[in-house]
Amino acid sequence: MDAMLIKNWNSVVGYQDDVYHLGDFSLTSAERSLRILEQLNGNKHLIKGNHEKSVLEKSFTREKFAWIKDYYELKVEDLDARGNRQSIVLLHYAMKVWNKSHHGAWHLYGHSHGSLPDDINSLSFDVGVDSHDYFPISYEQVKRIMSKKEFKPIDHHD
């Protein structure tokens, strides 16, 4: 399984690409995690999930990531987005509402392994590799999916 995941990752991620991994990177030892990390292309950023112990316990694995955070609000330059920048909230877990969700911000998450139903009325999406044939999903792929959705608030905000 490791070899397939590494091959799939490297087939779509270039050496200079930024990759945001939304948690549960590894359930194995720090040493095995390091061997995997050293084979993966890209500038790796990690949003902590509930299975990061082996990655977080050793500095030699932590150092393979540009940063490690619990939560992150990403801004992507995109001429099609409002203000030419797409706001994206990254968290391991799915949320019903998130910062700027009422203003077109997307929410990307993992954790659920494709078990949550996709909501056409929510600009959120499960980007876990097990939901996408074990390949990382690109910004352009997410953008195509989000373009088919329409946000409808479920709380008191408009």
Where are these regions (language model features)?
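Core catalytic region of metal-dependent phosphoesterases/phosphodiesterases
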Residues: 1-73
